Swiss-Prot record:
5-amino-6-(D-ribitylamino)uracil binds at F23, A57, Y58, E59, A81, I82, I83, F114. It comes from Helicobacter pylori (strain P12). Disulfide bonds: none annotated. The active site is at H89 (proton donor). Catalyzes the formation of 6,7-dimethyl-8-ribityllumazine by condensation of 5-amino-6-(D-ribitylamino)uracil with 3,4-dihydroxy-2-butanone 4-phosphate. This is the penultimate step in the biosynthesis of riboflavin. Gene3D superfamilies: Lumazine/riboflavin synthase. This is 6,7-dimethyl-8-ribityllumazine synthase. The gene is ribH. Belongs to the DMRL synthase family. (2S)-2-hydroxy-3-oxobutyl phosphate binds at G86, T87, R128.
Amino acid sequence: MRIIEGKLQLQGNEKVAILTSRFNHIITDRLKEGAMDCFKRHGGDEDLLDIVLVPGAYELPFILERLLGSGKYDGVCVLGAIIRGGTPHFDYVSAEATKGIAHAMLKYSMPVSFGVLTTDNIEQAIERAGSKAGNKGFEAMSTLIELLSLCQTLKG
């Protein structure tokens, strides 16, 4: 029996994008910083890292499809923060963003990591953006790095 898994190390020649929504920027800026830190710590070349900003989480899938379809990137780390309010808006945005991101990843068969927070309140978002619960941006980039490595291994 063989176990095949990715490594948490970049080769240094991977072209990666961090796609981040600006809405709830107090949270998404911290997620983005965590992802950038992870990329650098695990052998990424900053010159091969692009940061792409969109207004909100609903726009993430549209631009993700553009990035993946461009052929310029080996993978994309998607970040955002959708915080529940008093209307059903949260449910619609979180569902459509999630479905759209998954659809784009499968359509292009390329590594995409999901670092979009969906929380009930701002406190939960803060906890997941670098305090009690770690930094989910860092974790999302870790996932992308492992996926990139695994795809390389599976190529042979």
